[in-house]
């Protein structure tokens, strides 16, 4: 009997895709076997093409589908005259057709199966139709007593049949009563720990404003804080840290990031927060600030942003600022002022801004870098014009 299908188990759902509904198609297969013994086989005088048939058989007493075996002792035709041909014949069937696989074998003198041959697929049978093997076994091999295939001159054929019955569909819906794992609230929980100042063990004084914190959290998030609390520094022994180079609001936003990985007010203070992130080696926050500053680059602020990026080794921001300067310079030279990418403010020459003039005085190396980048980007486009060949 075939085993009935079952819906997917909850344990399987973590390793494979899960659909809202599912269906199993179970193809039922009925298997049965039949043994046919032919006594005094060597006396069979049937000529080539003549047939011996077994009695009919079925899968059970209530099965109306009847089968029989057909043997051509001296082959079916000239091609198989030196062979025994063996076929499975559908004698009667209540259906118009049926599909079945079959396997033939011989039983030797030790009652062991030998010389087995089987169909490679399920064949389509209709009433009166047979399938089998025209060259099942050579006659000379079969009749040779040394091979033990005709003990007491008896030929015993063994047949196994697998009949395909109707298919059955079993469908259903995936159970929604599986365990629902709550979302991770680590960031929210740590944020509440910071806001509520519970179990704090150190204190920061930022320009007169007090902030309480947890050494373990700070040390885990920042290598600078880790070094500060790990060594016998004054901040470690007194659990008190004085900070005079950061605005309290900037420090508060930085600490919110340390505890939660988020900085909701980043856009309002990206420049100052970049400096804080650089000072305390908060690399992710630093790149987040770079991204915010890149998205707000303008003719008026690009020089100041370039100085800021250079000061805090923000290489991605620095590259974007230089690229912005190059693009504005090229567009200005070409006179491209489309309303989409170029407005009246951008039309102002960057070199006329106070930020650029200040940068010339304080960071001349950045001016040189910007011009080098501009020259290298324009060389292919604005290279020395080639002399045109004179035409005769």
Curated annotation (Swiss-Prot):
A GO CC annotation given for this chain: nucleus
Listed GO MF terms: identical protein binding
Protein's recorded name: Speckle-type POZ protein-like
Residue intervals of the BTB domain: 200-267
Biological process annotations from GO: negative regulation of protein ubiquitination; proteasome-mediated ubiquitin-dependent protein catabolic process; protein ubiquitination
One Pfam family of this chain: MATH_2
Keywords assigned by UniProt, alphabetized: Nucleus, Ubl conjugation pathway
Protein family membership: Belongs to the Tdpoz family.
Location of this chain's protein in the cell: Nucleus
Record pathway: Protein modification; protein ubiquitination
Domain of life: Eukaryota
Source species of the chain: Mus musculus (Mouse)
Domain MATH, chain residue ranges per copy: 31-161
Functional description taken from the UniProt entry: Component of a cullin-RING-based BCR (BTB-CUL3-RBX1) E3 ubiquitin-protein ligase complex that mediates the ubiquitination and subsequent proteasomal degradation of target proteins, but with relatively low efficiency. Cullin-RING-based BCR (BTB-CUL3-RBX1) E3 ubiquitin-protein ligase complexes containing homodimeric SPOPL or the heterodimer formed by SPOP and SPOPL are less efficient than ubiquitin ligase complexes containing only SPOP. May function to down-regulate the activity of cullin-RING-based BCR (BTB-CUL3-RBX1) E3 ubiquitin-protein ligase complexes that contain SPOP.
Lineage: Eukaryota, Metazoa, Chordata, Craniata, Vertebrata
UniProt keyword annotation of Nucleus present: yes
Subunit structure of this chain's protein: Homodimer. Heterodimer with SPOP. Component of cullin-RING-based BCR (BTB-CUL3-RBX1) E3 ubiquitin-protein ligase complexes containing homodimeric SPOPL or the heterodimer formed by SPOP and SPOPL. Interacts with CUL3 and MACROH2A1.
PROSITE patterns attached to this UniProt entry: BTB (PS50097), MATH (PS50144)
Entry annotated with the keyword Nucleus: yes
